[in-house]
């Protein structure tokens, strides 16, 4: 069994009288440690499937198996716990608190995570050891993205 398995996943949105099928019986698997790319034209359902994998949306049918557990059947409380404890999700447009340093931004996020890692250590791991006391405006876009990852 793969680490991530999406099996026959369907997601539909209702826009007035129009039904939009964002994901139509999608199937794929990703092994643990494997790098995967989700590629497609605008409106192909890439963000939808990522939102479902990240626990921010749910599918209408199918299975979303992460490490042997089908999260497609999770209720709202279980999805919240999953988002907090089991998945990391970095958006294309991320938000850092502008008047907090990189380290303080990571410390803020670590307050809501069980067994959070040491903020200084994770900033070192993403190559920001010398920049942890800088404010977001003093960091490049890539450095800001790494703060978000940390």
Language model features with spans:
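ABC family nucleotide-binding domain
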Residues: 2-150
